[in-house]
């Protein structure tokens, strides 16, 4: 009798995606982050659901409701901090996942890559709106500053901002709609993640060598399910350590002050995972130019497949490209540091140089390195 997992319509989908899936035999721990992102997403949806049961999206009670969750709800503080720090873990996994894609040439699966870029934008939008919900000082002013950027759009900008706000400033209407969007978007992310996997399974996974591995595939289960479980355990350990020992390490102390439209915090800045983009934003003196640079800093990923000049897929055997890749990583860390600093000398000039270097590496140096490496190998 044929096994039910191979015949039942629903079980068959799960079987072909997670059990009998032919997988390259040589993929490394860098391929763990896809499943870790799935774990993070489920964790965020579950903790978010329980938080939403106690949260009120009204400007007068939002801050108090978060305090109530932490003080009065049974283990509410755990749920709240797992959700807040879970977002940080989500972004760490995201950056690792995208970095892996860049390093090993996974971006040549263009449909998978493009859905991934849409996912990245959606996750960033969700995280931004989630940061507004506790209605602390940084929530309010972060929302004001970031939504105000849309006013740089010629002609329709001001109307667009007021339309998003639901009034003439960030207020009750803004908070209510942000809560609604923050609730619905993770389910859209879940659907997009399924599409992401659908496209990936059309081609099969890439591998570190960048060479087609059709001749050497192994079943996903048990070989990679066990590795994914180990990865999930390590992620859980890291998250639990963060939540139980220093839950506010990655947050901003200003967000423990209730939102006050009459008092501006000394340094308005987003969460740490947006600081690199924030640094690029304020490294350009012109408002519209800054907004375009901000959007393009992520959208540039869509150009990467078009700028691939090497005849090899990944960077495993390309030392010149490897140097540029790690320079890019160092540059992004520099931008992250700059984004958290006050807008004054010498941070402005460092941010401008780091921003120029970021775009130069991706748009100019990496394609040139690919051509040089081809010539060195007489290809």
Curated annotation (Swiss-Prot):
Location within or outside the cell: Mitochondrion inner membrane
Chain positions recorded as heme b b566 binding sites: 97, 196
Keyword Cytoplasm: no
Cofactor(s) the record lists: heme b
Gene Ontology MF annotations: metal ion binding; ubiquinol-cytochrome-c reductase activity
One CC-aspect GO term: mitochondrial inner membrane
Pfam families registered for this protein in UniProt: Cytochrom_B_C, Cytochrome_B
Positions bound to heme b b562: 83, 182
Task performed by this protein: Component of the ubiquinol-cytochrome c reductase complex (complex III or cytochrome b-c1 complex) that is part of the mitochondrial respiratory chain. The b-c1 complex mediates electron transfer from ubiquinol to cytochrome c. Contributes to the generation of a proton gradient across the mitochondrial membrane that is then used for ATP synthesis.
Record-linked PANTHER family: CYTOCHROME B
Descriptive protein name: Cytochrome b
Native source species: Ursus maritimus
């Amino acid at each position: 009798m044929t096994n039910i997992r191979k015949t039942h319509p629903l079980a068959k989908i799960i079987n072909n995606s997670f059990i009998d899936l032919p997988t390259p035999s040589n993929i490394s721990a860098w391929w763990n982050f896809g499943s870790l992102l799935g774990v993070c997403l489920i964790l965020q949806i579950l903790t978010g659901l329980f938080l939403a049961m106690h949260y009120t999206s009204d400007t007068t009670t939002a801050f108090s409701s978060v305090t109530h969750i932490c003080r009065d709800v049974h283990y509410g503080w755990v749920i709240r901090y797992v959700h807040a720090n879970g977002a940080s873990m989500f972004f760490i996994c995201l950056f690792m996942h995208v970095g892996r894609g860049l390093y090993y040439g996974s971006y040549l699966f263009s449909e998978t890559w493009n859905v991934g870029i849409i996912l990245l934008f959606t996750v960033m939008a969700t995280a931004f709106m989630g940061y507004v919900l506790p209605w602390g000082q940084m929530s309010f002013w972060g929302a004001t500053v970031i939504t105000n950027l849309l006013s740089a759009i010629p002609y329709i900008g001001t109307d667009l901002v007021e339309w998003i706000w639901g009034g003439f400033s960030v207020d009750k209407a803004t908070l209510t709609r942000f809560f609604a969007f923050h609730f619905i978007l993770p389910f859209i992310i879940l659907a997009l993640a399924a599409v992401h996997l659908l496209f990936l399974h059309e081609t099969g996974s890439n591998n570190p060598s960048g060479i087609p591995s059709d001749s050497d595939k192994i079943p996903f289960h048990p070989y990679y399910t066990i590795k994914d479980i180990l990865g999930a355990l390590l992620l859980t350990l890291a998250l639990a350590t963060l939540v139980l020992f220093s839950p506010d390490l990655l947050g901003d102390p200003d967000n423990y002050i209730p939102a006050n439209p009459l008092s501006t915090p000394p340094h308005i800045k987003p969460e740490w995972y947006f600081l690199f983009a924030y640094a690029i934003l304020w490294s350009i003196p012109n408002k519209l130019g800054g907004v375009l640079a901000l959007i393009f800093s992520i959208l540039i990923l869509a150009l990467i497949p078009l700028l691939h000049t090497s005849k090899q897929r990944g960077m495993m055997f390309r030392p010149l490209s490897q140097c540029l890749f790690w320079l890019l990583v160092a540059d992004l860390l520099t931008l992250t540091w700059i984004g958290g600093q006050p807008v004054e000398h010498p941070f402005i000039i460092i941010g401008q140089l780091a921003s120029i270097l970021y775009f130069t590496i991706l748009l100019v140096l990496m394609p040139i390195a690919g051509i040089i490496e081809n010539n060195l190998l007489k290809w």
